[in-house]
Amino acid sequence: MTEAELIKCLSERFYSDFADTVARRVRDAGAVGLLYEVVTSRCEGLPRAVGHKVAFRGAYVLEKIYFDAPDSFMPYAGLFCRTDFPACADPSARRHFAKVMADLLGRFTPEVRDLERIAEAAARW
């Protein structure tokens, strides 16, 4: 799965089992890292409406992957806590990131300075 294919998949028509289907496709393609990168990139270079769809739906798919196969997300846990959770700017994506973070803090222990960033971001949201 290429970045262009992933963006197309996230920005096209939404359907009832979207998150399950896309999460399965991403995992089967070994593209969890690519999904993580796309979702946390702030979708620079995409038209605003497309960027919002990619951020929101990508965060939804990432949440699905996290809860269905947490081990596939764990390589990104440190980065998620350190920079990507606090930097999330899309209000719709924040909802999915917050669900992941609420569970992640029971499985992963971030650095103290990262915990402060997480708390500040959550309070700001």
Where are these regions (language model features)?
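Alpha-helical scaffold domains
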Residues: 1-125
